[in-house]
Amino acid sequence: MSTLSDVWLLLDDPQMTFSAGSRKVLPANTGAWIGNTSSTIGGDISIVFQGTSISFTGDTSLSTTSPTWFLAGIDLNSPYNVSFPGAGTQIYTQWYQTPMLPDGLHFVNLSSIFVNVDYAIITAGATTQLNGSTIVVDDRSSEITYTGTGWATSDTEIILGSGWVNGPPLGNTTHRTSNVGDGFSFRFAGSKIDVYGVFEWTATGNVDVDFVLDGETTSSSLFVPLNTVVVHPEILNYQLFSSGNLLAGNHTLIMNITQANGNQSFILDYLTYQPSFFFLVGKPNFTASASSASHLAC
């Protein structure tokens, strides 16, 4: 995956073109897939994108008779062989990323491929048109400011349970805490924001959380309801907060833990937002603004 300083654009599997395959859809917050969908491909994947690279994440093939490689063609260049990671063993992982490409419009065709696709990540370039896109911000991004002493970073794979392929969270890490008073803040220029994490269905107790968006508070509680039949010990892509539609412009989201009991945790994986700027040159540098304000206050 690209570096944390890059701007990543999320491309979910329904936004891709396949020559042959099928798509599974699950109810919200019940499975492991971004957007609650994934696609199993037996043929070609064709993508046109504007940026400097693209990567694909999903399950590699379970079948021992399926090819352990595929052909990757980029623009007018000759296709080349790519081997799946962990060939012979089914894993949920980033199974392909293009080399870094010149900023611009690119065509990628992955052929003779049998694989599962959950999502793709495009690294935006200066010429990438961002209107209508979804920016994804990893939990390790410097744009997220963590407060409190209880935060811990984890890079362990998520255990999804029988019938599912375990795998890493987006960006391979999460931030977790159960300390009252811990929180984070994030500033963005956009028209909608969502917060996603990992939920532990085998944990006990509760974590109560306040999300404050531009001064308006939304309270929620993370807990496992009584008599719940646990299907997944943990799940990825659990929606922790959604703003709904906002006026396009600059916004501030603050999260704060107000109560915690038992061993339940707040686990942050990533944020997504719809930008209100059209190109990277128009993206505000809130990190620099916060740093300048801090120096002025000293």
What are these regions (language model features)?
Residues M1-L296:
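Glycan-recognition surfaces in beta-rich domains, encompassing non-catalytic CBMs
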